[in-house]
Amino acid sequence: MTVAESFEQMPNVFNPAAAAGMTKTLQWNITGEEAGVWAFQIINGEGKLIPGGVEKPDITFTVSDKDWLSITEGKLDAMNAFMTGKLKVAGDMMLAMKVPSLFPTQR
């Protein structure tokens, strides 16, 4: 799976029930060979992917392409990646804690 393919799957694994009443934008800045920016916007529980990102996300995750794919494939725990500096988080940390429930098959 490529980085782009992993993001294209996000709307399919998004859990609208976990986002009920939520209006937030999450953004991922991916570095490395498959570098790119993707945002996922949630408005009143409905989500959509925004390739290229947005100007002012509520939270930004920065991670290498290889580590991102390892996280999405379940080979690297996101919390462990954060604690070891492989995954950087800026913005709403409470929102970061909700990501596993928003995207249950994304790790």
Q: How would you label these PLM feature ranges?
A:
Residues M1-R107:
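Feature captures hydrophobic
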